[in-house]
Curated annotation (Swiss-Prot):
NCBIfam families: ftsA, PRK09472.1
Organism: Haemophilus influenzae (strain ATCC 51907 / DSM 11121 / KW20 / Rd)
UniProt keywords, alphabetically: Cell cycle, Cell division, Cell inner membrane, Cell membrane, Membrane
Protein's gene: ftsA
Binding partners and assembly: Self-interacts. Interacts with FtsZ.
Annotated Gene Ontology cellular component terms: cell division site; cytoplasmic side of plasma membrane
Transcription listed as a keyword: no
Gene3D superfamilies in the cross-refs: 3.30.1490.110, 3.30.420.40
Major localization class: membrane
Superkingdom assignment: Bacteria
Function, as annotated: Cell division protein that is involved in the assembly of the Z ring. May serve as a membrane anchor for the Z ring.
Protein name: Cell division protein FtsA
Length: 425
């Protein structure tokens, strides 16, 4: 008997460049995800977050949804949707409000966050996330929770993530054409942080690389707060193209060879002399090459891709240190996503970043763990954890009228001070 999804059950949907993935699960009070169903199918009609064929995307989503419904024995009505692409932009902002009653209230915290998020975004962009970093009360800095503290002025520091409205609308349209409602839209990289990073790693300083087929999502935490997020529009598909061009083979054959035999280190550390038979195009006779020969092609590109991330980290370090902010990634680099499964990637990354590296799969999962205990499921599992533990919807809901939000926050603070003065006379 098919049953409807209960309210406590959450469905995550990721429409990636290479695959569409759906996970049905419930999140326990301790944050553990109980996986009830999984659906996955090759993705068509989308490239690096941009829809190129709406009908093809709809068909891919429907197949993945049907597979998840069959496994979970339920009917999916709504989803939490992941979004990525080079249109994603982020920045750090701050907002100030006066403290009316000398003691910080929750309303004043919310007002400070609203003020910080009320900047005028470039035309076409829509705010996705308002993520608090820390607060300051007068000269007391680096406060994680200012509630109840005494002072005159409250400052909120936040990390903002925005996306292009048209890209988001097109992706939502594809989902809605499948008869589904979109509950929330979440940046893929931010979702992945919920499933693979520990609080200790965030406190010590860590860089997460969500390595996909079309994009790499880069997230940097220091002192427990998200400081940097960026989408790099190059990833695993470039390696596939390199193999196809070097060996004069189809992209499908190149992808098969990459997944089964590629190494990110030269020479390949395991079975380097293994012969690989390559199916040529145009009726030509098959050829063969060794695994080490292949690694000469692939290792150079993986080193280059990770080097792009290293350059971003170097720029971030310089910017923060110019502001006298200490930048240390004591917990190193964590790599997840489908591209993280390439052999020897950990060793390659260690050479590039000169720090400890961890290849990560989703943490805190139970139920059908055999299906999702792999790096390519980190984002979609993270969607469930984000949906359960986060709600910045209230902060975002008023962000379209940024001017109104700003002056409303100031006016509310002024009214409180005036009322306090009146009460004393």
């Amino acid at each position: 008997m098919v049953k409807g999804v209960e309210t406590k059950t959450i469905v995550g949907l990721e429409v990636g460049t290479s695959k569409v993935v759906v996970v049905v699960g419930e999140v326990f009070p301790d944050g553990v995800v109980n996986v009830l169903g999984v659906g996955s199918c090759p993705s068509k009609g989308i490239d690096r977050g941009s829809i190129t064929d709406l009908d093809a995307v709809v068909g891919s989503i429907q197949r993945a949804i049907e597979a998840a419904e069959s496994m979970a024995d339920c009917q999916i009505m709504s989803v939490t949707l992941a979004i990525t692409g080079e249109h994603i932009q982020s920045l750090n902002e701050s907002g100030f409000v006066p403290i009316a009653e000398s003691e910080v209230t929750q309303e004043e915290i919310d007002s400070a966050l609203h003020t910080a998020s009320s900047i005028k975004l470039p035309e076409g962009l829509s705010l996705l996330h308002v993520i608090p970093q820390e607060y300051a009360v007068d000269r007391q800095m680096n406060i994680k929770n200012p509630l109840g503290l005494q002072g005159v002025r409250l400052k909120a520091q936040v990390h903002l993530i925005a996306c292009h409205q048209d890209w988001q609308n097109n992706l939502k349209k594809a989902v809605e054409r499948c008869g589904l409602q979109v509950d929330k839209v979440v940046f893929s990289g931010f979702a992945a942080t919920h499933s693979v990073l520990t609080e200790d790693e965030k406190d010590l300083g860590v860089c997460l690389i969500d390595f996909g087929a079309g994009t790499m999502n880069v997230m940097v935490y220091t002192n427990g707060a998200l400081r940097f997020s960026k989408v790099i529009p190059y990833a695993g598909n470039i390696v596939t193209n390199d193999i196809a061009h070097a060996c004069t083979i189809s992209r499908a054959e190149a992808e098969r060879i990459k997944v089964n035999y590629a190494s990110a280190f030269y020479p390949a550390r395991l079975h380097g002399d293994k012969k690989i038979e390559v199916a040529s195009i145009g009726g030509r006779a098959p050829r063969s090459l060794t695994k080490s020969d292949l690694s000469l092609i692939t290792s150079a590109r993986y080193t280059e891709l990770l080097g792009v991330v290293k350059d971003e980290l170097d720029k971030l370090k310089a910017e923060l240190e110019a502001k006298h902010i200490k930048f240390e990634l004591i917990a190193g680099v964590v790599i997840t996503g489908g591209g993280a499964q390439i052999e020897d990637l950990k060793e390659c990354a260690s050479n590039v970043f000169h720090c400890q590296v961890r290849i990560a799969s989703p943490l805190n999962i139970t139920g059908l763990t055999d299906y999702v205990n792999r790096p390519q499921y980190s984002t979609v599992v993270g969607l469930l954890q984000y949906n359960y533990s986060n709600s910045d919807d209230d902060l975002i809901s008023g962000s379209d009228d940024s001017e109104g939000t700003f002056f409303e926050s100031i006016w509310q603070g002024v009214k409180k001070i005036v009322n306090k003065v009146r009460s004393e006379f």
